[in-house]
């Protein structure tokens, strides 16, 4: 991905600094919400540059907070910037930015996990999935507490071509806890290789752009932060329903230090577990003694394809949840323990 060499020609007028905005409105980061403010405009400008050219692009910023990255985006000559902020304390500071950039900044008080963006931008900017990405870009300094559920939600949106991806293969430039960023780009065999690696990489081209030291944030988090760029692929590397892929991958990685047959076995009811797991691995041509971290995307493609066929043969298989079976067994065991006849009374 080629990064834009410089920010756009539009410049905001002189404004209070982000630090002054924080002081002016009495803002403070809420630890329970994993809030950390990025005050250095050189770093926010770098995030925007690494996102690529945003000239005449419709940008959706999630969690703008006091507006550090927001300023850098506005200075990139965007067509329009839509920000969605859940915390009402930040709205007055963002409104100040909106007043300084008439017609450029739209503020929505809402939750990014539930906000419907499908009709937020003009319909004429939509592109076919096979075409180049549309002039829409998602940018955000994500709170650690929502980053993983949010990216999983967006990955499912990609698979369905809905949500932010009704416009086409919308690009994303997002911050994550460094460990999460490393998992998103991890290669087969690395210790960071995980469920998140497979789920992201089967649907997107994923690039870890750079790392921001924790000391750059206020308050300083205990970890560094990674900036990640994701571009949806024209064709997913696994052509099965998202929920099916997610189920196979989740089960495979739940016992990441054991052989892969251990976790994959949890896809099947106990009565048929040994036989069905053996059949799955044999048909997928996978060594049952491989560790989950050594299962590649192509391994998971084979596993998902075979598991889909097994589900087609036995439709109840897809809805099977080993935790539910375990819960039922425990419940029956407790009932038996409490039965007077079973206790000899």
Swiss-Prot record:
Alphabetical keyword list: DNA-binding, Methyltransferase, Mitochondrion, RNA-binding, rRNA processing, S-adenosyl-L-methionine, Transcription, Transcription regulation, Transferase, Transit peptide
Binding-site residues for S-adenosyl-L-methionine, renumbered to this chain: 38, 63, 85-86, 111-112, 141
Transit peptide, start-end: 1-27
Family annotation (PROSITE patterns): RRNA_A_DIMETH (PS01131), SAM_RNA_A_N6_MT (PS51689)
Matches recorded under Pfam families: RrnaAD
Compartment(s) where it occurs, according to its Swiss-Prot or TrEMBL record: Mitochondrion
GO cellular component, one term: mitochondrial nucleoid
Tissue expression: Ubiquitously expressed.
GO terms, biological process: rRNA methylation
Transmembrane annotation, as ranges: none
A GO term for molecular function: S-adenosyl-L-methionine binding
SMART domains xrefs: rADc
Source species, domain of life: Eukaryota
EC number: 2.1.1.-
Catalytic activity: adenosine(N)/adenosine(N+1) in rRNA + 4 S-adenosyl-L-methionine = N(6)-dimethyladenosine(N)/N(6)-dimethyladenosine(N+1) in rRNA + 4 S-adenosyl-L-homocysteine + 4 H(+)
Knocked-out gene: effects: Mutant homozygous mice exhibit embryonic lethality. Conditional loss of Tfb1m in heart, leads to loss of dimethylation on adenosine(1006)/adenosine(1007) of 12S rRNA, decreases steady-state levels of 12S rRNA, induces instability of the small subunit of the ribosome and abolishes mitochondrial translation.
Quaternary structure and interacting proteins, as annotated: Interacts with mitochondrial RNA polymerase POLRMT. Interacts with TFAM. Remains bound to the maturing mtSSU until the late stages of assembly.
Alphabetical list of PANTHER family matching this protein: DIMETHYLADENOSINE TRANSFERASE (PTHR11727), DIMETHYLADENOSINE TRANSFERASE 1, MITOCHONDRIAL (PTHR11727:SF17)
Homology family: Belongs to the class I-like SAM-binding methyltransferase superfamily. rRNA adenine N(6)-methyltransferase family. KsgA subfamily.
Protein purpose: Mitochondrial methyltransferase which uses S-adenosyl methionine to dimethylate two highly conserved adjacent adenosine residues (A1006 and A1007) within the loop of helix 45 at the 3-prime end of 12S rRNA, thereby regulating the assembly or stability of the small subunit of the mitochondrial ribosome. Also required for basal transcription of mitochondrial DNA, probably via its interaction with POLRMT and TFAM. Stimulates transcription independently of the methyltransferase activity.
The protein, known as: Dimethyladenosine transferase 1, mitochondrial
Organism: Mus musculus (Mouse)
């Amino acid at each position: 991905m080629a990064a834009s060499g410089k920010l756009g020609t539009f410049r905001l007028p002189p404004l209070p600094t982000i630090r002054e905005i924080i002081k002016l409105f009495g803002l403070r980061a809420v630890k329970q919400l994993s809030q950390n403010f990025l005050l250095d405009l050189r770093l926010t400008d770098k995030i925007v540059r690494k996102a690529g050219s945003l000239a005449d692009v419709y940008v959706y910023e999630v969690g703008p907070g006091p507006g550090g990255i927001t300023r850098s985006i506005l200075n990139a000559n965007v067509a329009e910037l839509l920000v969605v902020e859940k915390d009402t304390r930040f709205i007055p500071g963002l409104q100040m930015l909106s007043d300084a950039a008439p017609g450029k900044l739209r503020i929505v008080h809402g939750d990014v996990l539930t906000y419907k963006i499908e009709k937020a931008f003009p319909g004429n900017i939509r592109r076919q999935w096979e075409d180049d990405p549309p002039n829409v870009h998602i940018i955000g300094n994500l709170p650690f507490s929502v980053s993983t559920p949010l990216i999983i939600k967006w990955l499912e949106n990609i698979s369905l071509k809905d949500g932010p991806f009704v416009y086409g293969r919308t690009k994303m430039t997002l911050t994550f806890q460094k460990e999460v960023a490393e998992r998103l780009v991890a290669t087969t065999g690395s210790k960071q290789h995980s469920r998140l690696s497979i789920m992201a990489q089967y649907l997107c081209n994923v690039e870890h752009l750079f790392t921001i030291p924790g000391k750059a944030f206020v308050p300083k988090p205990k970890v560094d932060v990674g900036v990640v760029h994701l571009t949806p692929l024209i064709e997913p590397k696994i052509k099965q329903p998202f929920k099916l892929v997610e189920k196979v991958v989740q089960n495979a990685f739940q016992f990441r230090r054991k052989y892969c047959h251990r976790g994959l076995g949890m896809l099947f009811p106990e009565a048929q577990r040994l036989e069905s797991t053996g059949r799955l691995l044999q048909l997928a041509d996978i060594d049952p003694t491989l560790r989950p971290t050594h299962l590649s995307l192509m391994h998971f493609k084979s596993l998902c394809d075979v598991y889909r066929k097994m589900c087609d043969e036995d439709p109840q298989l897809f809805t099977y949840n080993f935790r539910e079976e375990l819960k039922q067994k425990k419940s029956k065991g407790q009932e038996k323990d409490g039965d007077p006849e079973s206790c000899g009374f």
